[in-house]
Regions:
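Nucleotide-activated chemistry modules centered on ATP-dependent adenylation/adenylyltransferase
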Residues: 1-62, 78-375
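Short, glycine-rich nucleotide/cofactor-binding loops
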Residues: 62-72
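Long, structured ligand/cofactor-binding scaffold of large enzymes
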Residues: 74-76
Length: 375
C-alpha cells in the first residue's frame, strides 16, 4: 500500500493514478483548476442552458437532483440567482432519513423552488439494502441507484432534458470519469454503483419482483435519445470551492451537525440518513481509507491543514465500527454481531489488516480491525 506524497490517498483508491513524483491524480486535478479559463467555461455553460431554457415559460428550465445537503442547496440557489433558471428539484428520499436531513430539505424548499420528493417502497428498499450489504458490501446501494435513476425518469416524464448535477466526484477525487457531460456511458460506469457486478435487473434472483424495481431502472435508450436528456456537472464550468459554498448555504439556513459524523472529524456532509457511517466503514475495510481521509485531503488541498495534521486526524477518527445506530442496524437487517463480522471479513482486503496466528483478521475488544499501513 502506497500513499500520495502530497495528500493522504492510497494507491488502493479505485481510479487513482500517481505520477513519477508520487503525487496522485486527485491532487493534480485540484492544481489543474488554477490553470482553467473559468470565464470561458462559464460562457460554455451559458450556451448550454440557453439551448435548453424554456422560451415561453411553459416548462422548467432544468432538473436539479437534490438531497437537501450543502452541494445541492448551493446548486439550486446558484443557478436561480446567477442565471435566472427555473429548476424543478427532484429528491430520491432514502428510507432512513434523520431529522436533520428533513430540516435541511424543508430549508431548501423555503428558499423558493418547486420540488418533487420520491419516496420508494420501504420494504423493497430494505431488501435491496440487505442485498447491497451482503452481496456488494454497500448498505446504501439502493440510494446510489435511485439518486441517479429517479431524476432521469422525472426528466423524461416532464420533458425536461437538462439535468444539472454538482461536482463531478470522479474528477474532484481523482477518478477516471472526468468529462463535463454526465451521459449514459458515465452513468453506467460511475452512476449506479456496482452495476457491472450487479445490474439492477438481476436482483430478481433474490426474490424481488421486477415491477418493484422500476424506481431503480433508467428510462429506455429510445426515451433518453428522443428527449435529448443531457446531464452536466456544475463543477465543470465553475470553480468548485466547498468551503465558500458551505458559507453561502449556511447563510441560507442550512444546518450542520452539532458534532462530527462518525468516521470523520467534519460535521457538514452526509447529514441526511442513518447508515452513511456504515457505508464509509465498508469503504475503509475494502480500500484502507475512509471519510476522514477524504476530508483531510480536501483540507490539505485548500491549505487548511498540513499533511501531518491530516495524518493525525485520520488516525483518530477513521477505521472504527459505527456505533450511533449499530444495534438498530443489526436489528433492521436481522443480523447478529457474529454475522456482521462475517460480512466484514467477506469484503475486507485481508492484505491490509493485521491477522491472528490462525490467519483470521485480528479484532480488538470493540471488534475493530487494525490497519497495517499508514501514510
Amino acid at each position: 500500500m502506497e500513499f500520495c506524497k502530497s495528500c493522504l490517498y492510497p494507491n488502493t483508491k479505485p481510479g487513482l493514478t500517481f505520477n513519477h513524483d508520487g503525487v496522485c491524480s486527485a491532487c493534480l486535478n485540484h492544481k489543474e483548476k488554477n490553470k482553467i479559463d473559468w470565464d470561458e467555461r462559464k460562457q460554455h455553460f451559458i450556451e448550454i442552458i440557453e439551448k435548453f431554457r424554456s422560451r415561453d415559460g411553459s416548462n422548467y428550465d432544468c432538473i436539479i437532483p437534490v438531497s437537501g445537503g450543502k452541494d445541492s442547496t448551493y446548486q439550486a440557489y446558484f443557478v436561480k440567482k446567477e442565471f435566472g433558471l427555473k429548476p424543478l428539484l427532484v429528491n430520491f428520499i432514502p428510507r432512513d432519513l434523520v431529522p436533520l436531513g428533513r430540516k435541511n430539505i424543508e430549508n431548501l424548499k423555503k428558499i423558493g423552488f418547486d420540488y418533487i420528493e420520491f419516496t420508494p417502497n420501504p420494504i423493497v428498499y430494505r431488501k435491496l439494502a440487505k442485498i447491497g450489504l451482503t452481496e456488494l458490501g454497500d448498505v446504501t446501494w439502493p440510494e446510489h441507484h435511485g439518486l441517479f435513476t429517479v431524476p432521469t425518469k422525472i426528466a423524461v416524464a416532464y420533458k425536461i432534458p437538462l439535468i444539472i448535477w454538482g461536482e463531478n466526484p470522479q474528477s474532484e477525487y481523482g477518478g477516471s470519469g472526468t468529462g463535463e457531460i454526465l451521459d449514459r456511458e458515465w452513468l453506467l460506469k460511475h452512476g449506479g454503483y456496482f452495476l457491472d457486478k450487479m445490474p439492477i435487473e438481476k436482483v430478481t434472483q433474490f426474490g424481488i419482483e421486477s415491477e418493484d424495481l422500476k424506481p431503480y431502472s433508467y428510462p429506455t435508450d429510445k426515451e433518453i435519445t428522443n428527449l435529448g436528456v443531457t446531464g452536466i456537472f456544475l463543477g465543470s464550468y465553475f470553480k468548485w470551492d466547498i468551503f465558500k459554498q458551505l458559507e453561502i448555504v449556511r447563510g441560507l439556513g442550512f444546518s450542520v451537525s452539532d458534532k462530527p459524523k462518525e468516521g470523520t472529524y467534519q460535521n457538514w456532509e452526509n447529514l441526511d440518513e442513518k447508515y452513511t457511517g456504515m457505508h464509509d466503514y465498508f469503504k475503509w475495510i475494502k480500500y484502507g481509507f475512509g471519510r476522514a481521509t477524504d476530508h483531510a485531503c480536501i483540507d490539505i488541498w485548500y491549505n487548511r491543514i498540513t499533511r501531518d495534521e491530516g495524518r493525525k486526524l485520520v488516525s483518530e477518527y477513521e477505521g472504527k465500527i459505527p456505533t450511533w445506530y449499530f444495534d438498530e442496524f443489526l436489528q433492521d437487517f436481522e443480523l447478529t454481531r457474529t454475522q456482521f463480522y462475517e460480512i466484514v471479513d467477506k469484503f475486507a482486503n485481508h492484505a491490509l489488516f493485521k491477522k491472528d496466528t490462525d490467519g483470521k483478521l485480528h479484532r480488538d475488544a470493540e471488534g475493530n480491525l487494525e490497519l497495517l499501513y499508514h501514510p
